[in-house]
């Protein structure tokens, strides 16, 4: 299944500016998985295997990348779902968290890709401000750029990942050229976490 990530442009090589402001020789776009039901089922199953080991009452997606995965996982596991906006609405209810009530409940946070951890830290803080208890965070891919450490340091919350970038790269090694592989390995070497 993993080779389909290249075919569908889920993993891209080049020079990319990330939402964190960092420049990267690779880009991960898990939104492309949403248009491929077979691959989507596989990705959901990978998340599910981690979630089955955790104790939680509610699944909360991080906007925007985590929302579709949180929604499908909530439906699949029979758990209520919510999502955290990047900032509160200025109209309507003005809520930061939409969906099921998090107050007094054990929450697992879902996102697609982890870089610096800023989005997940923001979501954890919002959930705690609303009275939720954060049991953990799960991402499909940890880019290995100190995000897990940043989250643990800032919030005490453990992050679980389906893949770490080096592991994904090793799985893709037979499908990419040596220059692409080396470029990513050299880039990741600068992150000492």
Swiss-Prot record:
NCBIfam families assigned: pyrE
Binding site for 5-phospho-alpha-D-ribose 1-diphosphate: 85, 89, 91, 111-119
Disulfide cross-links: none
Name of the featured protein: Orotate phosphoribosyltransferase
Highest taxon listed in the record's lineage: Archaea
InterPro entries, A to Z: OPRT, Or_phspho_trans_dom, PRibTrfase_dom, PRTase-like
Listed GO MF terms: magnesium ion binding; orotate phosphoribosyltransferase activity
Gene this protein is translated from: pyrE
Keywords of the record: Glycosyltransferase, Magnesium, Pyrimidine biosynthesis, Transferase
GO biological process: 'de novo' UMP biosynthetic process; pyrimidine nucleobase biosynthetic process
Pfam family, one: Pribosyltran
Upper classification of the organism: Archaea, Thermoproteota, Thermoprotei, Thermoproteales, Thermoproteaceae
Entry binding sites for orotate: 115, 143
Protein source organism: Pyrobaculum islandicum (strain DSM 4184 / JCM 9189 / GEO3)
Cofactor(s) required for function per UniProt: Mg(2+)
């Amino acid at each position: 299944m993993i080779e389909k990530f290249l075919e569908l442009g889920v993993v891209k090589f080049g020079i990319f500016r990330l939402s964190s402001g960092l420049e990267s020789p690779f880009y991960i776009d898990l939104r492309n998985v949403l248009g491929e039901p077979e691959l989507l089922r596989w990705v959901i199953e990978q998340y599910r295997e981690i979630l089955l080991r955790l104790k939680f009452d509610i699944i909360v997606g991080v906007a925007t990348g985590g929302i579709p995965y949180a929604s499908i996982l909530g439906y699949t596991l029979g758990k209520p779902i919510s999502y955290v906006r990047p900032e509160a609405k200025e109209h309507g209810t003005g809520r930061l968290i939409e969906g099921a009530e998090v107050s007094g409940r054990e929450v697992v946070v879902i996102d697609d890709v982890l870089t610096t951890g800023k989005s997940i830290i923001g979501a954890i803080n919002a959930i705690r401000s609303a009275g939720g208890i954060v049991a953990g965070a799960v991402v499909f891919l940890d880019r290995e750029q100190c995000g897990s450490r940043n989250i643990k340091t800032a919030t005490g919350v453990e992050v679980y990942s389906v893949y770490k970038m080096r592991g994904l790269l090793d799985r893709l090694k037979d499908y990419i050229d040596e220059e692409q592989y080396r470029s990513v390995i050299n880039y990741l070497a600068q992150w000492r976490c």
